[in-house]
């Protein structure tokens, strides 16, 4: 990639239909893990106008009121009025869970290469990434796209912008100079609103567009990056019908929003609703943990990790490091350090990151990475010092 370029990432709010589905799936997972952390869960959700469908595979000793969990999640997001197209009190919730396949379970319970270790729950490849563009070691476009829709939800819920409704999308186009973030070229923010938003905004002595720019965008984005920035606020002019009424929502359909905004490859596996024996989730978290510690250690300014697994096999097929020429030691040497300092077998990941806990509902909106939440163990940089010492730095 050239040193001077534009790069864009997007995010969506907790009220986006796909994110509603993700949050319900992870709330189901948390409710199960609260009672039985050894459960096997693959909880999928569909949302549409006035309807929620819960399906997938669950093997557990927990007794969970799945319908109530779904309703509570919809209420927390803010869909509490029939005018919004889905309402936590009146929506239909259909439940259609099966148990995990015995064929899958036997491979996961007993790894073929080492019976003492848990095998991977499926084959697949996962990526982790970190870079020095932000203090959180995330790419700047996705980091700030998340913060925009997060603030939209905050101002909606606390009543400062009462005309806002739950569904929203953001997009940040960053200008890079010499390979580093220089300024923000364009911000797109589309937010659902009440039918009378123009009148309501006028009462606030600001136009709708000005209110969004001044109250949501400018408090979030670094002032020094707002040089001749273009703002596109609700470019279609109207966004009243939204959420599951506007589009059918499905679990796992925002995988780029959930990760790095397109800054690195994605293996294709979604996260929400999956227990950590599913390496789609746990290994992607571990790969972020590895990449972040490498950058925090000063071994590279940016780092991409790929791991791959076979179903029922504990040890990864490969652990590949790519630093795009920013490493202070060769990539193959960094990869060797990874193998020495991180246990990337599924059971090792679960223990290393303490993943058998009800911590997942919080991950399901505003990004799984780059958030300094105490539950997000994959964001720790506790191995950076050891990596730096082992590299002789």
UniProtKB/Swiss-Prot annotation:
Free-text function comment from the UniProt entry: Catalyzes the formation of S-adenosylmethionine (AdoMet) from methionine and ATP. The overall synthetic reaction is composed of two sequential steps, AdoMet formation and the subsequent tripolyphosphate hydrolysis which occurs prior to release of AdoMet from the enzyme.
Entry EC number(s): 2.5.1.6
UniProt xrefs under Pfam families: S-AdoMet_synt_C, S-AdoMet_synt_M, S-AdoMet_synt_N
Pathway membership: Amino-acid biosynthesis; S-adenosyl-L-methionine biosynthesis; S-adenosyl-L-methionine from L-methionine: step 1/1
One GO CC term, this protein: cytoplasm
UniProt cross-references to PROSITE patterns, sorted A to Z: ADOMET_SYNTHASE_1, ADOMET_SYNTHASE_2
Sections of the chain in a coiled coil: none
Cofactor: Mg(2+); K(+)
BP terms from Gene Ontology: one-carbon metabolic process; S-adenosylmethionine biosynthetic process
Gene3D superfamilies assigned to the protein according to its UniProt record, in alphabetical order: 3.30.300.10
Chain sites annotated for binding ATP: 16, 167-169, 238-239, 247, 253-254, 270, 274
UniProt organism field: Acidovorax ebreus (strain TPSY) (Diaphorobacter sp. (strain TPSY))
Region (Flexible loop): 100-110
PANTHER family in UniProt: S-ADENOSYLMETHIONINE SYNTHETASE
Cofactor detail note: Binds 2 divalent ions per subunit. Binds 1 potassium ion per subunit.
Residues where L-methionine binds: 57, 100, 247, 278
Subunit annotation: Homotetramer; dimer of dimers.
Annotated catalysed reactions: L-methionine + ATP + H2O = S-adenosyl-L-methionine + phosphate + diphosphate
Gene Ontology molecular function: ATP binding; magnesium ion binding; methionine adenosyltransferase activity
Designated name of the protein: S-adenosylmethionine synthase
Residues annotated as binding K(+): 44
Binding site for Mg(2+): 18
HAMAP family with a match to the protein in the record: S_AdoMet_synth1
Sequence similarity: Belongs to the AdoMet synthase family.
EC main group: transferase
